[in-house]
Structures are given as structure tokens and as C-alpha cells.
């Protein structure tokens, strides 16, 4: 983790430069992220399903100076005037690997001045029309979001404990999350990755989703948390090999990106030792919005959850909305 900031800084003309990452989930994605934001530069995780034209648009739009990617994502970008670093998992002699990029640099964290309101990330999110929109987030915005998640998670756990229910503590050496969604999305990067850094939770990373492989990883790695779209936990429940594995380590079956059918909530709670949860957020809010879990979610399976501080719920009946297009 300490070498990427040094090597990234040495390749930069300014600490505020923009660096882009596009690869499937792998540990070097995380190393690159920490190296970029650790020097006060802007990290731009791009959709790994994009094709060359879409990648080129985003790179030119955000004026990226350096690109970390795997072989498949770097393909077709030969004419793009940008420094390209390839993941060590997909070596190619045409590019410098991440291992080579960091080898000659110190393990000491560089001394750089970073303001709380300096930009840290740009996540591209599709709009209703036109090209994807780049969403800027600051160092303060991301850190405050992670602490807000920690706060509400602690409150929910304490409530379950008072009610005599089994609960998932925020910290502990036994905690492990199955990172089963893309790191280029705020659910993967914030809820799974960055929260794990804060609380010291083990990350069990999947390159891509496969319900059968997920069951095996939960069994082998004693996974306690899983957060993804509701379909993923539903696939675990209905997989033909489910009963071949010990899934009793699971404590949280998190979901987001869409509602769960009420009947699914009930069946998940009845068939897993872990309890289902749900959340709602936006790229623009670093995934922060609402959360629900435990008995409250079981009793109100159609809910999107309670508003998480510092998010404020606003009633549209008290708003005067514009009547003309701006």
C-alpha cells in the first residue's frame, strides 16, 4: 500500500493530476486507488465493461494523465497519449506492469499537503440521455460517508443486541466480507472496500460473480458479510449446491441497487443464519442514503430503510418545484 503513492507521485507533474483505473476486481485495483488518493490526486475508476470508444471518451473528458488497466481494457488504446500501466495479473511486454512501476520506490508514505475539500474521485454514472456523467467527490465527502456508515451500523447492531438477537459487530478479527460487486461502483469501493479499511475487515474478492463460487468462498473463508444486488443473495438461496456448504458464518446479507421482493426477505431470513439488510444511495452521495436491517426490515420488507445521518429526508409536499425547463 505504501509504494504506490511514491511511484504515482514520481510520475506526476502535479499532485492534483487525474489517474484512471479500469480492470476487473483484483488487489492491484485497491493498491492503485490508495496510491492515487494518498497523494491528493483524483482517482477515476471506469466501468470494466466499456469498449475502447467509451474508455477514450472518459479519459479525454477527465483529462487523465496515467491509466492502470488489465490487458483486455488496454486493448485498442495504442494511439491514446497517456501513460499506461498494466496489472501484473495480465502481463504484456508492451506495457509496464504495476509491480515494475512500484519496485524502485520507498515504503515510506510521501509527505504531501491534502485539504479536506480536495477532489479525490470521479465516478462515471449513466444519465437518462447522452454520455455518462462524471461525479466528483472530495476527500471529506468520502471519509464522512464511511464514518456515517460506521455510525449507523453500530446503532443497528446495538439495537439488535438489546432485543436479544444475534448481531454483527462493527469490528473483530473474525469479520470478512465477500466483495462480489465491481470496484468501479460505489457499492464495491465504498461499502465493501473502504469500510473494510476502516474497521479492519478481511476482504474476500471475487473477479466476477458466480453463485457457486461464492458459496465455496463463504464456506472456506468464513465470510460474515455479503453486500450486492438483491438477486445475488437470492441466487445463493436457490443454488442447487447450497446445502453442501457451511454458511453459518454469514451474519449480514446486504442488498442495494434495487428493492427485494417482500417474500424474498422472509425466505432469506428463514433459510440463513445471517439476516437480510437493504440500503439505498447514489453515486453522487458516495452510496450514502438509507439503511435497514434486523427485525425492522423483516417487519417492513418493502422499506428502503431509515435515512442515515447526515442525509435529510425531504417531503415533496413542502417543495416548490420549477415549472419551466432550465
Identify the residue ranges that each predicted region occupies:
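Conserved pre-ATP/AMP-binding loop-to-beta segment of ANL
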Residues: 106-124, 131, 168-176
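Gly/Ser/Thr-rich phosphate-binding loop
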Residues: 127, 198-199, 220-228, 237-299, ...
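Conserved AMP-binding/adenylation subdomain of ANL enzymes
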Residues: 143-179, 184-224, 239
Amino acid at each position: 500500500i505504501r509504494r504506490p503513492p511514491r511511484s504515482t507521485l514520481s510520475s506526476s507533474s502535479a499532485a492534483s493530476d487525474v489517474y484512471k483505473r479500469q480492470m476487473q476486481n483484483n488487489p492491484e485495483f485497491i493498491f492503485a486507488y490508495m496510491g492515487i488518493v494518498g497523494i491528493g490526486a483524483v482517482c477515476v475508476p471506469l466501468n470494466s465493461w466499456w469498449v475502447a470508444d467509451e474508455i477514450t471518451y472518459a479519459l479525454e473528458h477527465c483529462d487523465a494523465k496515467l491509466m492502470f488497466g488489465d490487458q483486455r481494457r488496454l486493448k485498442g488504446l495504442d494511439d491514446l497519449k497517456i501513460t499506461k500501466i498494466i496489472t501484473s495479473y495480465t502481463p504484456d511486454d508492451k506495457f509496464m506492469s504495476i509491480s515494475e512501476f512500484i519496485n524502485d520506490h520507498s515504503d515510506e508514505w510521501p509527505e504531501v499537503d491534502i485539504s479536506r475539500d480536495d477532489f479525490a474521485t470521479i465516478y462515471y454514472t449513466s444519465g437518462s440521455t447522452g454520455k455518462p456523467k462524471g461525479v466528483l467527490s472530495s476527500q471529506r465527502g468520502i471519509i464522512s460517508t464511511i464514518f456515517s456508515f460506521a455510525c449507523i451500523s453500530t446503532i443497528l447492531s446495538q439495537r439488535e443486541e438489546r432485543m436479544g438477537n444475534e448481531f454483527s459487530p462493527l469490528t473483530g478479527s473474525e469479520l470478512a466480507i465477500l466483495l462480489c460487486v465491481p470496484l468501479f461502483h460505489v457499492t464495491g469501493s465504498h461499502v465493501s472496500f473502504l469500510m473494510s479499511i476502516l474497521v479492519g475487515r478481511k476482504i474476500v474478492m471475487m473477479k466476477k460473480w458466480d453463485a457457486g463460487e461464492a458459496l465455496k468462498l463463504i464456506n472456506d473463508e468464513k465470510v460474515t458479510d455479503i453486500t450486492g444486488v438483491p438477486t445475488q443473495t437470492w441466487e445463493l438461496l436457490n443454488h442447487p449446491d447450497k446445502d453442501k456448504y457451511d454458511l453459518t458464518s454469514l451474519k449480514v446479507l446486504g442488498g442495494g441497487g434495487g428493492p427485494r421482493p417482500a417474500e424474498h426477505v422472509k425466505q432469506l431470513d428463514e433459510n440463513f443464519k445471517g439476516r437480510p439488510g437493504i440500503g439505498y444511495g447514489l453515486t453522487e452521495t458516495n452510496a450514502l442514503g438509507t439503511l435497514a436491517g434486523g427485525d425492522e426490515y423483516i417487519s417492513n420488507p418493502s422499506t428502503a430503510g431509515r435515512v442515515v445521518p447526515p442525509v435529510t429526508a425531504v417531503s415533496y409536499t413542502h417543495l416548490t418545484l420549477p415549472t419551466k425547463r432550465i
